[in-house]
């Protein structure tokens, strides 16, 4: 009687990175290209280099059948000013009968997340809005430590010092209510476009600042947002590196 060949495991690990304003998402996909089922797949990620923190536990894929993919996401934050990030992952799994354990690893990924250096370039408000509509964006809101009317010019000057051109500025005040809006634009050395719009508003004792950032290149969203937020927090007297 002819014996059938044992089914083989063929596990491939495919890493990737996605960008958010306040986090980097490290993505690890485990693909089963073999004929046997893998069980108890554990994916452990680790920052190998750079001023970053990854404090999430290992992620599990209980069953990975042939031809299927299991994916885990890990959120990475910056300890201080972002720099170069190197991240990797280890994958442990068992064969279908649970008798033999296996390990695999994701090739390390290294990416430069330093905030871009910009130069101010004037464009018309209409052109700024048109560029912003075609850019990747992120929004943020901060509670201001003092009234919006005093904080607004401080914020505007701080952004100008970061190499951004002030395109437009509008203020409105009536009684205890104040609203200030300003838009900025700049280019980095590769001529990637960046923009920021801030809206400071206050009524009675409550004041907030809305921040809207736009980037032309996805990989610069994290660093640019960090720079804008840090500059604003420092200018108004808040710790620059806190979330």
Label each region the model flagged.
Residues 1-20, 80-243:
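Acidic, serine/threonine- and proline-rich intrinsically disordered appendage/tail regions
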Residues 9-10, 39, 48-60:
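Short beta-strand and strand-turn-strand segments in soluble, beta-rich domains
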Residues 22-26:
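Structural beta-strand segments of beta-rich domains
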Residues 27-33, 75:
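Short edge beta-strand/loop segments characteristic of extracellular beta-sandwich folds
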Residues 31-51, 90-92:
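Short acidic, flexible loop segments centered on an aromatic residue
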Residues 31-33, 60-62, 214, 218:
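A short interface-forming secondary-structure element
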Residues 61-70:
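Short proline/glycine- and polar residue-rich coil/turn motifs
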Residues 70-80:
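Short, hydrophobic beta-strand segments
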């Amino acid at each position: 009687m002819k014996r059938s060949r044992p089914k083989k495991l063929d596990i491939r690990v495919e890493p990737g990175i996605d960008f958010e304003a306040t986090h980097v998402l490290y993505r690890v996909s485990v693909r089963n290209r073999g004929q046997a089922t893998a069980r108890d797949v554990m994916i452990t990620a680790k920052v190998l280099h750079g001023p970053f923190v990854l404090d999430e536990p290992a992620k599990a894929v209980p069953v990975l059948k042939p031809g299927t993919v299991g994916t885990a996401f890990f959120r990475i934050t910056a300890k201080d000013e972002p720099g170069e990030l190197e991240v990797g992952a280890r994958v442990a799994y068992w064969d279908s009968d649970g008798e033999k354990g296996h390990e695999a690893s994701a090739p390390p990924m290294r990416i430069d997340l330093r905030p871009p250096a910009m130069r101010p370039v004037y464009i018309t408000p209409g052109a700024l809005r048109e560029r912003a509509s075609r850019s990747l964006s992120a929004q943020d809101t901060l509670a201001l430590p003092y009234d919006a009317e005093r904080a607004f010019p401080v914020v505007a000057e701080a952004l100008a010092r970061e190499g951004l051109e002030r395109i437009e500025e509008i203020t409105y005040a009536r009684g205890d209510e104040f609203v200030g809006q300003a838009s900025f634009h700049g280019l980095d050395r590769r001529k990637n476009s960046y923009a920021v719009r801030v809206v400071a508003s206050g009524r009675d004792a409550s004041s907030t600042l809305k921040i809207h950032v736009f980037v032309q290149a996805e990989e610069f969203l994290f660093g640019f947002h960090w720079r804008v937020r840090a500059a604003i927090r420092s200018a108004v007297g808040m710790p620059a590196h806190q979330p």
